[in-house]
Amino acid sequence: MTQWIAGEWVEGLGEEFTSLSPYDNQVVWRGKGATAEQVEMAVKAARQAFVGWKKLSVAEREAMVLAFAEQVKENSEEIAQVIAKETGKPLWETRTEAAAMAGKIAISIRAYHERTGESQKEAAGNQIVLRHRPLGVMAVFGPYNFPGHLPNGHIVPALLAGNTVVFKPSEQTPWTGELAMKLWQAAGLPQGVINLVQGGKETGIALAESKGIDGLLFTGSANTGHLLHRQFAGQPGKMLALEMGGNNPMVITDHYGDLDATVYTIIQSAFISAGQRCTCARRLYIPLGEKGDALITRLVEATKKLRVDQPFAEPAPFMGPQISEAAANFILAAQANLQSLGGESLIEAKAGEAAFVTPGIIDVTNIAELPDEEYFGPLLQVVRYQTLEQAVELANDTRFGLSAGLVSTDDGEWQYFVDHIRAGIVNRNRQLTGASGDAPFGGPGASGNLRPSAYYAADYCAYPMASMEGEETLLPATLSPGVEL
């Protein structure tokens, strides 16, 4: 039983698909996808549930969400184990994701009260009231890199605001999506408030095309996000929130401070989660000269020693495999293409068993037309530069704008960087992959439109209703010109 529709677990009627553990290619989940007809059943179930769900008080909806939070906490180790088996991420990392699932719920609740809710004031004898109302049925598309944590940042704010949800996990991580829905079920969520549809591309197309949804919340690749944007063209009545990827630059200056601390910050930025975070550093700008040379030498030495292994290995690895062999082959093909364009590998990424790829670093300084692509994996491009102004200009030469970072102890360099860089997340002397759940998450350009973090998700899960109110109608002492009573 792979689909959860109207509170019932039912078998999919579409094509069979499987989830393979990327570190050994073992099948960890098997089922059939939802057909277009089943997707419509899920949307209709969500529409029917919306009538009662939106009428509940905020306190009642919040209590249901908190019950889910307790389920997450009680089952955190199972969540971590499932995510590790399905994504290949090290167990230490998936345990942090399980904890973040619960932590993001508290942020979402606070955000609802601070950014939405109801407020009123008096002006010129009128009560000016601001209320917020749910949009209706929200489709949520989840990614594979954080299959528990990131969908939660959409689903919880949507439910708190009074919406109902149809959730489609990534076809790479159906097991995690199924487990999350079973925890909602255990929390006592009324039937139809969340509906789960599993499947691949065809299931996703059917959900996005459904006339019964009022909005779509998406985290995933830029290519899929752009397809959704075109699909929603001419439908201003539907809300579309896109959080996509980035070709993220990290600039190091001669004033980088401690050498090992800088190397560690780069490694955390480029290779954590095997490079499968949308905020990972893809382009590393290092100054020409002795200090830059020393940094590269140390970075190469440290990267060669990174432990790459299956998630349950002892001692624990720093990173695991790519999500699939296809994803691994994409990284190797990208490396080969950059080499053919004139790039020089400082460390060559190499294929291992199943979906494993070792970290790669390639100097692309001599490539005249550097491809503006997101290489979603452990492949770091190095560019040598002469001036900070040149580095920032090169860093901004991308259609993306998700994250960027500067490593420098010089306040003047930081001020120049933060004034001229184009990105939604800009860090100083911290890893690019570090982001706060109560800060906006997203960026301009091809990286998306809205800010789908837990805190700012409240902004697009409800619409504001402005009212001017009085207890009775009023007749002014002086009527408007041309009016006689």
Curated annotation (Swiss-Prot):
Signal peptide start and end residues: none
GO MF, one term, reads: succinylglutamate-semialdehyde dehydrogenase activity
Q: Which InterPro entries match?
A: Ald_DH/histidinol_DH, Ald_DH_C, Ald_DH_CS_CYS, Ald_DH_CS_GLU, Ald_DH_N, Aldehyde_DH_dom, SuccinylGlu_semiald_DH_AstD
Which UniProt key words apply to this protein?
Arginine metabolism, NAD, Oxidoreductase
Source organism's superkingdom? Answer: Bacteria
What is the similarity comment for this entry? Answer: Belongs to the aldehyde dehydrogenase family. AstD subfamily.
The major lineage groups are: Bacteria, Pseudomonadati, Pseudomonadota, Gammaproteobacteria, Vibrionales
List of residues binding NAD(+): 220-225
Pfam families given for it?
Answer: Aldedh (PF00171)
Q: Which PANTHER family match?
A: ALDEHYDE DEHYDROGENASE-RELATED
Q: Which protein is depicted? A: N-succinylglutamate 5-semialdehyde dehydrogenase
Q: Where is the active site?
A: 243, 278
Its function, per the record, reads: Catalyzes the NAD-dependent reduction of succinylglutamate semialdehyde into succinylglutamate.
EC number, UniProt record: 1.2.1.71
Concerning SUPFAM superfamilies, the annotation shows: ALDH-like
Which reaction equation describes what this protein catalyses?
N-succinyl-L-glutamate 5-semialdehyde + NAD(+) + H2O = N-succinyl-L-glutamate + NADH + 2 H(+)
In its UniProt record, which GO terms are filed under biological process? arginine catabolic process to glutamate; arginine catabolic process to succinate
Pathway entry: Amino-acid degradation; L-arginine degradation via AST pathway; L-glutamate and succinate from L-arginine: step 4/5
